[in-house]
Amino acid sequence: MAIKDWPEGEGPRDKLLVKGAAHLSDAELLAVLLRNGLSGLNAVDLARSLIHEFGGLRSLLCAPKHQVCRLPGVGPVKYAQLQAAAELARRVAQENLQRGQVLTNPDLTRDYLMRQLADRSYEVFAILLLDSQHRVIQFVELFRGTIDSASVYPREVVSLVLEKKAAAVIVCHNHPSGIAEPSQADRRITERLKNALATIDVSLLDHMVVGDREIVSFAERGWIN
């Protein structure tokens, strides 16, 4: 049944306007963005099929254009709408870690890194630069590709830290496999970076590894002394 034929107030857009977005299911929120479905499928049905196909909203929004647009009912326009929504979410997260904000809430940092790095199809190694009061200076993506002890150059990290006059840093990278458990290579990278930063009297506060649904903190495991 087409959504326009549903009882008044039951459509996802009407429900959002009356009850608020928090009362909508994932499929209903997605249907608001999609606006319409295709023959035999209304927008909510199409949204459910997309979520099922990709295994969740995050995987759908991070999927490349060719994977999304090959599905019936989703062309370049709908793909663009989804990407705009995903980018808005990233920018909201970015505003939550504004320059000058003091990092007193570990959950805020985790949420930010999860939004920035989870579900990337390639590895990204990044650094969160902080001043002596642990206020945010900048978040910088340094390396992309296969991240191992040979591809992360401590001298580039040190150079950036000196350029930005950072007093402390948090480094992070993602695992495209979705499993956040650190590897031995991750531990070697961390040790090399900690030693390099110590030569310029800068503290490595943490190394966070981002998976699909969790973040592993080296500091919480006692791996950074």
Swiss-Prot record:
TM regions (residue ranges): none
Signal peptide: none
One Gene Ontology molecular-function label: metal ion binding
Annotated keywords: Hydrolase, Metal-binding, Metalloprotease, Protease, Zinc
Residue numbers binding Zn(2+): 173, 175, 186
Source superkingdom: Bacteria
Gene3D superfamilies according to UniProt: Cytidine Deaminase, domain 2
The keyword Secreted belongs to this UniProt entry's keyword annotation: no
All residue ranges annotated as the MPN domain in the record: 102-224
GO-annotated biological processes: proteolysis
Pfam families linked to this entry: RadC (PF04002), UPF0758_N (PF20582)
Disulphide-bridged cysteine pairs: none
InterPro entries in alphabetical order: MPN (IPR037518), RadC_JAB (IPR025657), RuvA_2-like (IPR010994), UPF0758 (IPR001405), UPF0758_CS (IPR020891), UPF0758_N (IPR046778)
Extent of motif JAMM motif: 173-186
Family the UniProt entry places it in: Belongs to the UPF0758 family.
NCBIfam families listed in its UniProt record: PRK00024.1, radc
Name of the protein this chain belongs to: UPF0758 protein Shewana3_3770
